[in-house]
Swiss-Prot record:
Name of the featured protein: Translation initiation factor 2 subunit gamma
Gene3D superfamilies per record: P-loop containing nucleotide triphosphate hydrolases, Translation factors
Name of the encoding gene: eif2g
Originating species: Thermococcus kodakarensis (strain ATCC BAA-918 / JCM 12380 / KOD1)
Limits of the tr-type G domain: 9-202
Residue ranges the record marks as coiled coil: none
The UniProt record lists the keyword Metal-binding: yes
Keywords: GTP-binding, Hydrolase, Initiation factor, Magnesium, Metal-binding, Nucleotide-binding, Protein biosynthesis, Zinc
Family the entry assigns: Belongs to the TRAFAC class translation factor GTPase superfamily. Classic translation factor GTPase family. EIF2G subfamily.
Enzyme class, broadest EC rank: hydrolase
Renumbered residue ranges of the record's region G1: 18-25
Oligomeric form and interacting partners: Heterotrimer composed of an alpha, a beta and a gamma chain.
Binding site for GTP: 21-26, 145-148, 180-182
GO molecular function: GTP binding; GTPase activity; metal ion binding; translation elongation factor activity; translation initiation factor activity; tRNA binding
Length: 410
C-alpha cells in the first residue's frame, strides 16, 4: 500500500489544446481522473466552453521505469515515486471560443497539442498552434489521439502529415506520441514526454506577487442568512511571487463606475481570507495550477466571472493600467482558423480589433498607424507591463480570427 504523501501544489501549468472533439477532455480525464466539462451547457453540448483545470501527480515506477499518475504502478504493481504535481488546463477547441483559449494560453508553461488520428490537422489545430506561437510557448508535446479508430498505415501517414504541419513553428521539434485516451494506451509514454519536454519554469518566489484572474464567483447559496455570507472568490493562476492568507491585495484595473456618462475603472483593495490550490485550503500559494482566493469583497462584484481579466498583487506593486496602447505589431501572412486561405490585410485606421492581454480581452479602436506600430483606444482598460505580448484578432465573417501579435511599447 502506498504511503500517504503530504499535499503539494501543482508547479507547472500544461495546456490541452487542439481542434474541437479531438479528445482533449477525455485525455485530461485519462491523466487526472477528472472530467473537466462540468458546466451544465458543456455536458449538454459535449464541448468545453469554460477553461477547466485538473491536477495530477506524475509518478515513476522504480521497478519497471514507466510513468503513471497512480501511487501503485498499473504495469507491474510496485509502489511508484513522486516526480511532480502538474495542472492540466483544458482549453476549448471550438472556433467560437478562441478568445477563451487565448486567455488560457497566457497561463500555460507548456502544452499538449491533441490531434485525432481519424481527422488529422484541422482549422482549430492550426489556430491553437498559432496561439501557442503568439504567446511564445515552446514547450510542446503532440498527442496523436484516437489511434483505435484507424489502422497502422493511417497512423504513419498522420505522423508524416503532422511533421510537415509543424515545420518552421514552435512545435517543430515536439515529440509526436500515438495514444488512445479512451483506452489509456501509451499514456505512460506521453507522461515520459511531458517530463522531458515540459520542464517546470525557474521562478523567483521573492518577486512581487502577480496573479492573472480567469474567473470569479459568488459562492453563497440563495437564501443564505446575512451573518453567514462569505466574500467574493477570485480564481486564476499566480505567474510570479506568492500569496498568503491575510495579505492585503490590490485588483487592477478593478471595478467599473460611471462618471459624466463615461465608464471608468477604479482599482480595489481587499484582504485574502482563504486560499485554495488543487482543491485544498492552503496558507500560502505559488505559481502553478488554479488558485482560488477568498476575499472580503462584496460577492456582487465577483459573481459570474465579472473579475476575469484583472490582475492581483500587493498594493502599489502592480503594472500600470492602460486606456490606450501603442503596440509594435507583427502580422501573420494568413488568417488562422478559416477553411479557405485568406491573406491578412494591413490594419486600418478606425478599425476595431480584439486584443488579448494575459487573461484580459478588450476591444481596441485604431487611432494611429506607424511603420510597425499601431495606436489603439481601449474599450476596457488593461493592467500590463511594457513589453507584454498582446494577441490581435480581427472580425472575419461572423468570427474573431487571429491575425497577429504585438508588444506593448511606452
Amino acid at each position: 500500500m502506498a504511503k500517504k504523501k503530504e499535499f503539494r501544489q501543482a508547479e507547472v501549468n500544461i495546456g490541452m489544446v487542439g481542434h474541437v472533439d479531438h479528445g482533449k477532455t477525455t485525455l485530461t480525464k485519462a491523466l487526472t481522473g477528472i472530467w473537466t466539462d462540468t458546466h451544465s451547457e458543456e455536458l449538454r453540448r459535449g464541448i468545453t466552453i469554460k477553461i477547466g483545470f485538473a491536477d495530477a501527480e506524475i509518478r515513476k515506477c522504480p521497478h519497471c521505469g514507466k510513468y503513471s499518475t497512480s501511487p501503485v504502478c498499473p504495469y507491474c504493481g510496485h509502489e511508484t515515486e513522486f516526480e511532480r504535481r502538474v495542472s492540466f488546463i483544458d482549453a476549448p477547441g471550438h472556433e467560437a471560443l478562441m478568445t477563451t483559449m487565448l486567455a488560457g494560453a497566457s497561463l500555460m508553461d507548456g502544452a499538449v497539442l491533441v490531434i485525432a488520428a481519424n481527422e488529422g490537422v484541422m482549422p482549430q489545430t492550426r489556430e491553437h498552434l498559432m496561439a501557442l506561437q503568439i504567446v511564445g510557448n515552446r514547450n510542446i508535446v503532440i498527442a496523436l489521439n484516437k489511434i483505435e479508430l484507424v489502422d497502422r498505415e493511417k497512423v504513419m501517414e498522420r505522423y508524416q502529415e503532422i511533421k510537415e504541419f509543424v515545420k518552421g513553428t514552435v512545435a517543430e521539434n515536439a515529440p509526436i506520441i500515438p495514444i488512445s485516451a479512451l483506452h489509456g494506451a501509451n499514456v505512460d509514454v506521453l507522461l515520459a514526454a511531458i517530463e522531458e519536454f515540459i520542464p517546470t519554469p525557474k521562478r523567483d518566489p521573492n518577486k512581487p506577487p502577480k496573479m492573472l484572474v480567469l474567473r470569479s464567483f459568488d459562492v453563497n447559496k440563495p437564501g443564505t442568512p446575512p451573518e453567514k455570507l462569505v466574500g467574493g472568490v477570485i480564481g486564476g493562476s499566480i505567474v510570479q511571487g506568492k500569496l498568503r492568507v491575510g495579505d492585503e491585495i490590490e485588483i487592477r484595473p478593478g471595478v467599473p463606475y460611471e462618471e459624466h456618462g463615461r465608464i471608468k475603472y477604479e482599482p480595489i483593495t481587499t484582504e485574502i481570507t482563504s486560499l485554495q490550490a488543487g482543491g485544498r485550503f492552503v496558507e500560502e500559494a505559488y505559481p502553478g495550477g488554479l488558485v482560488g482566493v477568498g476575499t472580503k469583497l462584496d460577492p456582487f462584484l465577483t459573481k459570474g466571472d465579472l473579475m476575469a481579466g484583472n490582475v492581483v498583487g500587493k498594493p502599489g506593486q502592480l503594472p500600470p493600467v492602460w486606456d490606450e496602447l501603442t503596440l509594435e505589431v507583427h502580422l501573420l501572412e494568413r488568417v488562422v482558423g478559416t477553411e479557405e486561405e485568406l491573406r491578412v490585410e494591413p490594419i486600418k485606421r478606425r478599425e476595431v480589433l480584439l486584443l488579448n492581454v494575459g487573461t484580459a480581452r478588450t476591444m481596441g479602436l485604431v487611432t494611429g498607424l506607424g511603420k510597425d506600430t499601431v495606436e489603439l483606444k481601449l474599450q476596457i482598460p488593461v493592467c500590463a507591463e511594457v513589453g507584454d505580448r498582446v494577441a490581435i484578432s480581427r472580425q472575419v465573417g461572423s468570427r474573431w480570427r487571429l491575425i497577429g501579435y504585438g508588444f506593448i511599447r511606452e
